[in-house]
Amino acid sequence: MTANIIDGKAIAKQVRSAVAQRVSERVAQNLRAPGLAVVLVGLDPASQVYVGSKRKACEEVGFISKSFDLPANTTEQTLLELIDELNNDQEIDGILVQLPLPEGLDVEKILERITPHKDVDGFHPYNIGRLAQRMPALRPCTPKGIITLLDSTGVRYKGLHAVVVGASNIVGRPMALELLLAGCTTTVCHKFTQDLETHVRRADLLVVAVGKPEFIPGDWVKEGAIVIDVGINRLDSGKLVGDVEYSVAEQKADFITPVPGGVGPMTVASLIENTLEACEKYHS
């Protein structure tokens, strides 16, 4: 058996097209286009690539896009003042501060400064709390995108045993909340988990987000499972691989996301969806 590929690029394109259509309708009704402000501090090469893709996606769907590229030595106070300005900017519906930030900047303090209704990354404690209480507002982008990918398979995943490997604030923890909301029986594995293999082998639905190349051997994957690989790792050879040993896993899984072209495009698509939602729900 060879797994069905969950094509994140194609699904993300559909999402962007739907958003672009809605933006066109708004403009035709003399309503303003949604606005997204992207803040980049420093010259981290990976961050520059990610920010570039987000800005490009904004332009494609017709958003107002404002960019703020700040030097690495930017003070925390300067960054907080910029966020305050954007919180009060009526053309801006979403504020994104690209992570990681340079050393010396308090990430928690900075992210919490963003007003929750403009927190289109979904990282603010208010938005995470809403998700935990089964009243989601603006949802974290990567987990939200993964739910869209799962829905695309047509598989009824309510009641499935879902295993999330990785417990970061950005992916693992909110992913577990999304899966609970969807009706899965959910296990979260992390660096202190004993006998990881046993947990993984039981997973009907496996989500891996640890940032380590081929960390999960493919033969651990349960026959017929759905595998969502969030990782994207560059080997010394230059090849990009995920956190799961793909070549073996695809022979056992029923559905699997490729790397690249799986989860990554959906993260940006979800950001675009969140910005439109923030505009229409909170700022129109």
From Swiss-Prot:
SUPFAM superfamilies: Aminoacid dehydrogenase-like, N-terminal domain (SSF53223), NAD(P)-binding Rossmann-fold domains (SSF51735). Coiled coil: none annotated. NADP(+) binds at G166, A167, S168, I232. The gene is folD. Its EC number is 1.5.1.5, 3.5.4.9. It catalyses: (6R)-5,10-methylene-5,6,7,8-tetrahydrofolate + NADP(+) = (6R)-5,10-methenyltetrahydrofolate + NADPH; (6R)-5,10-methenyltetrahydrofolate + H2O = (6R)-10-formyltetrahydrofolate + H(+). Homodimer. The keyword Cell wall biogenesis/degradation does not apply. The keyword Transport does not apply. This is Bifunctional protein FolD. Gene3D superfamilies: Leucine Dehydrogenase, chain A, domain 1, NAD(P)-binding Rossmann-like Domain. Keywords: Amino-acid biosynthesis, Histidine biosynthesis, Hydrolase, Methionine biosynthesis, Multifunctional enzyme, NADP, One-carbon metabolism, Oxidoreductase, Purine biosynthesis. Catalyzes the oxidation of 5,10-methylenetetrahydrofolate to 5,10-methenyltetrahydrofolate and then the hydrolysis of 5,10-methenyltetrahydrofolate to 10-formyltetrahydrofolate. Pathway: One-carbon metabolism; tetrahydrofolate interconversion. Signal peptide: none annotated. GO terms for biological process: L-histidine biosynthetic process; methionine biosynthetic process; purine nucleotide biosynthetic process; tetrahydrofolate interconversion. One of its GO terms (cellular component) is cytosol. One of its GO terms (molecular function) is methenyltetrahydrofolate cyclohydrolase activity. Pfam families: THF_DHG_CYH (PF00763), THF_DHG_CYH_C (PF02882).
